[in-house]
């Protein structure tokens, strides 16, 4: 089983600080819970739209999220 990526860890840490979970993120970002899980666990690369929606939902800039993604590749 693959561990969370730095991208996934960053998002999960922010969700924890906000008292929210993946289901909340899915609802607030307009993404399916399955897609959110796949992204956070590194099984699926997020689309630009998904990164944008996630950034708005958790209050982290799209630049920071994108940098984290680029650092992993």
Where are these regions (language model features)?
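Short alpha-helical DNA-recognition segment
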Residues: 20-38
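The alpha-helix within a helix-turn-helix
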Residues: 15, 26, 55
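A short, Lys/Arg-rich alpha-helix, primarily the initiator
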Residues: 1-21
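Short, charged recognition helix plus adjacent turn
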Residues: 19, 56, 64-73
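Short, basic-rich loop-to-helix N-cap that marks the start of a DNA-contacting helix
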Residues: 43-56
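Residues that mark the N-terminal boundary/hinge immediately upstream of a DNA-recognition element
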Residues: 10, 21, 47-50, 61
